[in-house]
């Protein structure tokens, strides 16, 4: 049985009540997202609260951690309460579509999301895991429409998605007035094609700076670049 928690340098994330466990995608999102000068941050689909906690560690902003699943929201709240930044992070258990419609007068300097990524694929019997993994409950169109309503004029939206969804996601984003400014192609082993990508969007059209990140040079041997990006979080970096 896997361990029910993951210990980071400054906080612990319990994930035994959450469908999606602590993973590389979330760690990369929390470490790579630009947060300079951010006063207000929104984490869409916070799950365990991992990304919200990482961003709170990196800056002094207030953070809203939004989660549709009740059990995950409860565990995120518990993880956050035990952390050094409990007073700056608020967990809200609500559907993002409802939240964006009700709160469109609120604006966030930074919005992040590690959204469900399976489309039209076979589902498992676990409804909680389906919600976390399948985008039936929140399509990319709905996500980006809500983001465009809530992002401040000079704000940044950063997302982690499958590489094969990158072009279509950018097309949908541009229809909402959001344009890529940075993109990170994540390669898990030498010689392999990127399977994941992180993209930062703004309302400003500009050349997109593209980078590549190799996470492992061999099995269980992290690359120097990955260590540099995540060393403030992992215990053994």
From Swiss-Prot:
Compartments, record wording: Cytoplasm
Any one GO biological process: tRNA processing
Alphabetized UniProt keyword annotations: Cytoplasm, Methyltransferase, S-adenosyl-L-methionine, Transferase, tRNA processing
Root EC class: transferase
Catalytic activity: adenosine(37) in tRNA1(Val) + S-adenosyl-L-methionine = N(6)-methyladenosine(37) in tRNA1(Val) + S-adenosyl-L-homocysteine + H(+)
Matches recorded under Pfam families: MTS
InterPro entries reported in the protein's UniProt record: DNA_methylase_N6_adenine_CS, SAM-dependent_MTases_sf, Small_mtfrase_dom, tRNA_Adenine-N(6)_MTase, tRNA_adenine-N6_MeTrfase
Gene Ontology MF, one: nucleic acid binding
Any one GO CC term of the record: cytoplasm
Domain of life: Bacteria
EC number: 2.1.1.223
Function per UniProt: Specifically methylates the adenine in position 37 of tRNA(1)(Val) (anticodon cmo5UAC).
Family according to the record: Belongs to the methyltransferase superfamily. tRNA (adenine-N(6)-)-methyltransferase family.
Protein name listed in UniProt: tRNA1(Val) (adenine(37)-N6)-methyltransferase
